[in-house]
Amino acid sequence: LSLSLRAKASIAGIIGLLITLGIARFAYTPMLPIMREQAGLGLGAGGWLATANYAGYFTGVFLCGRISDLDLKDRIYRWGLILAVISTAMMGMVASELGWAISRFLAGLSTAVGMMLGGALVMNWLMRNGHRAELGVHFSGVGLSVVMSSFAVLMLSEHVLWWENWLFLSLLGLVLVLPAWAWLPKPMPAPAVEHESKMQDRPPTVAVRRLLLAFYFCAGVGFVVTSTFIVAIVNALPKMEDVGFWVFVILGAAAAPSCILWDLIARRVGAIDALLLASVLHIAGILLPLVGEGLFGPIAGALCFGFTFAGIVSMMMGLAGRFYPTRPAKMMSTLTIAYGIAQILAPAITGWISEQTGSYNAGLFVAAAVMTVGLVMLLQLRGVARLPDELDS
């Protein structure tokens, strides 16, 4: 019975990510070139819509971090699933940049709810039932979200117009809400006695906290530019007009198992060294699409980027759970605010740069440079004296 409940909880969490992240957020990436062609969406406007999405995400993270009642978290999470469906349908029901921006903002709210409250509810259930405080299985839903949204857009775009595509995506989301809602267990308000020792909060030192926040801000910049614009970037390369979609699919396929693998790597070498390795590969993934003129660069970049971006998120959220096992959303929200600020600023800056240069390529160099600064933060964190044991447990 325990295994069955664990499986249902894990699957519900993954499906929740498919809805709030895959349909509400990641579908925008393969839809971006379609909307540029069919709806007249400009380069700069594409960046600003992404910024609106992350403004909603940032707002949602801030609000989620202020919620301490588990039952309230559960209710808001479930309604966040519905909001993801509504905001996706809005993209096809309006034909103005203002309407799209409102839709993207609401989608960002739902993504924050899915990432923050969904992850916290799943971790709460795992820890209160004596399981490891790891979210690798849960965050495999990030990679699956990329794959699902990409194929959904591909199959639909061959038969329908851009606005119909969004409506069909919202219908898919509505169908997925049913198992996501039904299979997620109700939160457990009190820890079982035999697991009480695992539920003691162990806050990080001020130095560790600041370095983690600085690194995660840099990781947010490193993530958002590629994840938002990769399809458009690759399609704009010489002789790559139709390759961008497949690069995005490869990225998602690489991400799907990555969180589980990074959990195993972190167990072996420690969380900080695992994050260092992931960050080096992440930088390579950002820059490789611009190397050479063939398929090697985009494909190798997608593999490196996909294998690392979700793993970084999963490991950072896992650390938050170890620091605050009774209130994992507490530090999750603080970290994600830093991540969210980066994701508000970077798309707008990339959109502005793209208007000046005529392409999104320069944004990749900026993202790689910022991610390199994040590497320095990790190296400093690695040298902090008396690093809390839970970082490398």
Spans of features found by a protein language model:
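C-terminal transmembrane helical hairpin of 12-TM major facilitator-type secondary transporters
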Residues: 272-316
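Helix-to-loop junctions at the C-terminal end of transmembrane segments
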Residues: 60-72, 258-270
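Extracytoplasmic gate region of multi-pass secondary transporters
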Residues: 29, 209-249, 253-257
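Paired small-residue
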Residues: 87, 98-106, 296-304
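Conserved MFS/SLC helix-loop-helix module at the cytosolic interface between two early adjacent transmembrane helices
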Residues: 61-95
